[in-house]
């Protein structure tokens, strides 16, 4: 097994947090091999909890800062389920409005409008499957990428469904999405409540879901922290520096509702 820089960074971080005894557990299971034959494994304890949760629950929420691998792991688990014949298709979606910019103001057809906001999803698919195979599966509609609004009225059976950037859903959008769950399907809902781009008077569907769904047996919530950041170590420090402000904003918003 080749040990890379991210592995060393993870080990050092776990030593600092007195968790080094759990380091070996991260390498016990290979999820899948990527397009180059390199094994994909979890890199932090938070990621391990996330992967285990997806295996054990129908719906898993992954909540935490950027750089924790939420999107990449979700796509990895979806492709793994597809390759094993556990599902027949993968559906990836997200809210279509970001930072006050409506898709209606972007040129081109639907795919061109959505694609700029889905680069992390495409990057993950290309790394795991390769660009050619990803394109073929999309042409056969085995992999579908679409705005959240296009999920309305559908029942998603035999599917692995991923909602990314869920912090930017409204309460009704979140309810609409979750009620699409069909038989023999799994859902992953990822989001970062410190990066909500909704108007200040609109409550995030992700925050609302945490409050309403926490006691449903087959739904689980996994919370990532700066310790789970798998990018450059400075990124984790930046996230920690910014953590207090978003929390206070969210608390203030909830108090006024």
Model-derived features with residue positions:
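Conserved helicase motor core of SF1/SF2 NTP-dependent helicases
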Residues: 35-163, 167-257
């Amino acid at each position: 097994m080749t040990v890379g820089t991210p592995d060393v960074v993870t080990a050092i971080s776990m030593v600092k947090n007195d968790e080094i005894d759990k380091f070996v557990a991260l390498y016990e299971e290979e999820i899948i091999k990527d397009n180059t034959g390199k094994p994909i494994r979890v890199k932090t304890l938070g990621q391990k909890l996330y992967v285990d949760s997806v295996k054990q629950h129908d719906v898993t929420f992954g909540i935490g800062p950027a750089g924790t691998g939420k999107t990449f792991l979700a796509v990895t688990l979806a492709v793994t389920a597809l390759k094993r014949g556990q599902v027949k298709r993968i559906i990836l979606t997200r809210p279509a409005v970001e930072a006050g910019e409506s898709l209606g103001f972007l040129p081109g057809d639907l795919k061109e409008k959505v694609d700029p906001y889905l680069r992390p999803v495409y990057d993950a698919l290309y790394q795991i499957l390769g660009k050619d195979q990803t394109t073929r599966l999309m042409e056969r509609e085995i992999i579908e990428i679409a705005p959240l609004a296009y999920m309305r009225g559908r029942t998603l059976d035999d599917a692995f469904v991923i909602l990314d950037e869920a912090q930017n859903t409204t309460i009704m959008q979140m309810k609409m999405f979750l009620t699409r769950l069909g038989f023999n399907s799994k859902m992953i809902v990822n989001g970062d409540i410190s990066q909500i781009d909704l108007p200040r008077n609109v409550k995030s569907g992700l925050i609302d879901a945490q409050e309403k769904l926490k006691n449903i047996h087959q739904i689980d919530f996994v919370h990532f922290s700066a310790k789970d950041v798998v990018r450059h170590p400075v990124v984790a420090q930046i996230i920690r520096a910014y953590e207090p402000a978003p929390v206070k904003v969210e608390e203030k918003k909830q108090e006024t509702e």
